[in-house]
Amino acid sequence: MKKPFTLIELLVVIGIIGILAAMLMPALAKAREKADQTDCINNQKQLGMAFVLYGNDHKDWFPSYTDGSGGAKKEGGWVYYDGFPCPTKGNFDVTRGILYPYTKSRQVYICRSDHTGSKVSYGANSDTKDSKFSQVDNPTGTPLLLEEGSTKETTNDGFFNIDYTPKDYIVNRHQKGSVYSFCDGHVSWERWSDKEVWAKCDFAEPITNF
């Protein structure tokens, strides 16, 4: 007959398990953060491709965005929102946006690290409105989409322009950085140096404050 474990032995085993768990938790959390970052990169790759496909089908024009003002239902943007009231995290309907036929997925609009409850985690460069892909002087350095915040200080309305009230701020959801897609199609993680830097890109002067 096997001798049963003593209370001390059981406590030692429990203590060892607790120590191992404490050692593993940071690594597991970091792995989860990395997985969320990778998922966000994939989202923006799919959205960026949708922008390109739309341009191919519409004589090189970028998809439009809506102007962020309240008091109207905004049709025809890359995402759709109901402006009653001014855009909030709950009144987007991505299935009515002009890019949804290309994405065919609600999930690509949402970063897994975005815990605000918003239906859209990204904002489009405001200078793409009424512009063509061929007008971009430096596609590699000109952001197309970025992660936009949605807090009491800022609003996420599907386009990004810091010269707007409330302010548009980039949000760092991934290891003190953020994921950006660029007009040449590449997507990368970058660290933004100042949340109040001008984010309305001039096509001849791409954002460099990373």
Q: What are the language-model segments listed below?
A:
Residues M1-R32:
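N-terminal single-pass transmembrane signal-anchor helix
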Residues P4, A35, D194:
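Alpha/beta-hydrolase active-site loop signature
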Residues T38-F210:
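Short, well-structured segments within or immediately adjacent to enzyme catalytic domains
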Residues M23, R32-N43:
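Juxtamembrane interface helices immediately C-terminal to a transmembrane segment
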